[in-house]
Design a protein with these regions (language model features):
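N-terminal type II signal-anchor transmembrane helix
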Residues: 1-25, 63
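Extracellular/periplasmic catalytic domains that process cell-envelope and extracellular macromolecules
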Residues: 15-17, 25, 48-51, 130-132, ...
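Short, glycine-/polar-rich solvent-exposed loops and beta-turns at beta-strand/coil boundaries
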Residues: 16, 35-36, 68-73, 114-118
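Short extracytoplasmic
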Residues: 14-41, 47
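Solvent-exposed loop/turn segments at secondary-structure junctions
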Residues: 31, 40, 62-64, 82, ...
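N-terminal post-signal-peptidase region of extra-cytosolic proteins
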Residues: 7-10, 36-45, 59, 121
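Non-catalytic, structured segments within soluble enzyme domains
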Residues: 90-242
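Flexible, acidic/glycine-enriched loop-and-adjacent beta/alpha segments
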Residues: 44-98, 154-156, 161
Length: 242
């Protein structure tokens, strides 16, 4: 009861849409410039390919469609580990489901404390009662920070591959799914080998969760990842429109 007092209002999430970046198009219909401190492009959950969703579920919350906002096993494990961490003075660890991450990203601070984790769990439980799973997933995939100033998977797809979500391969989607855990550590422009190892781990989880067949896994694990950052040109056309 103590922690449930004075919690932020979560009902605005039903209609929330992030502020997206302003884009300038050349007269061929291509993006010539993108103005924003944070790169954002909102994509409806119905427009996100299943294999992209499955990559993130495998990496972040494989039980997303079966839990009520919190993962009891994960919380039990985190509580046990955190009791040891408190004694030893180590950083507290999380057990965040996707819904808990939505609660934290939209409604709470990022400080790591037991009180915030309790509030996060309460809010996650309430959000699950108020919003559909599809809406929660849509919020998460459009708001999650994925490095290089990219927020949301559509922006990250452009930042790392210069592709729309539908153009991604499964292995490329798996690479993007490595980023929420630690965007700086797994930034492929800085730590490619580390990121590729994590990408292979995500593909293995997709196989384990029956999102990939054995043949599909073997095909994707062998694919070479080619990074391609979108380079916007202000001068290649004389006529622009917004």
């Amino acid at each position: 009861w103590y922690f449930s007092n004075d919690l932020p209002n979560y009902r605005f999430l039903e209609t929330y849409k992030p502020a997206v970046s302003s884009k300038i198009y050349n007269n061929n219909g291509d993006i010539a410039a993108d103005f924003a401190v944070q790169k954002r492009t909102f994509v409806s959950i119905d427009e996100i390919p299943d294999f992209v969703v499955n990559a993130f579920l495998s990496a972040e919350d494989k039980n997303f469609f079966n839990h009520p906002g919190i993962d009891a096993k994960g919380i039990t494990r985190a509580i046990f580990n955190n009791l040891q961490n408190i004694v030893s003075g180590k950083r507290l660890e999380g057990a965040s489901t996707i819904t808990q991450q939505v609660a934290k990203n939209f409604l709470l601070t990022s400080d790591v404390s037991l009180s915030r984790k309790v509030k996060e769990a309460i809010l996650a439980f309430r959000i699950e009662k108020y919003l559909s799973k599809k809406r929660i997933l849509e919020l998460y995939l459009n708001e999650i920070y994925l490095g290089e100033r990219a927020y949301g998977i559509a922006s990250a797809s452009m930042v790392y591959f210069d592709k729309s979500l539908k153009e991604l391969s499964i292995s490329e989607a798996a690479l993007l799914a490595t980023l929420p855990k630690a965007p700086s550590t797994y930034n492929p422009y800085r730590n490619l080998n580390t990121t590729l190892k994590r990408k292979d781990w995500v593909l293995a989880r997709m196989l384990e969760n029956n999102f990939l067949s054995k043949n599909g896994y073997e095909k994707e694990i062998k694919k070479t990842i080619v990074l391609k950052k979108r380079k916007l040109n202000f001068y290649n056309e004389s006529l622009f429109f917004t």
